[in-house]
């Protein structure tokens, strides 16, 4: 996985201040496998808790990031995996399609669009969400 030198500002809601993470591009199989494993354990815990409370759980709670990343690796000219890391942990994952979609409205008709196929915050981020993006 390639680390960008540019830092990514995110707002830490618990400390009420801006902190800086690292934008990662590409795949590090071992790192993503570990992240996927950790996220799945946390998702199962959240799912059980919400079921006992009679609540629904997020649609993405069944996602298998290992499978999604393997698919992205098969199409590297089309799909790119991004992650945001803070404090040694991946806080969010996203897969972007940068070839297949084009703008339909003027003045950008025909120009390529970045299409976010999948995006997820780490399930270990407590509610209310610990981090949020900056505008």
Predicted regions and their residues:
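Non-catalytic substrate-recognition and accessory regions of acyl/acetyltransferase enzymes
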Residues: 1-134
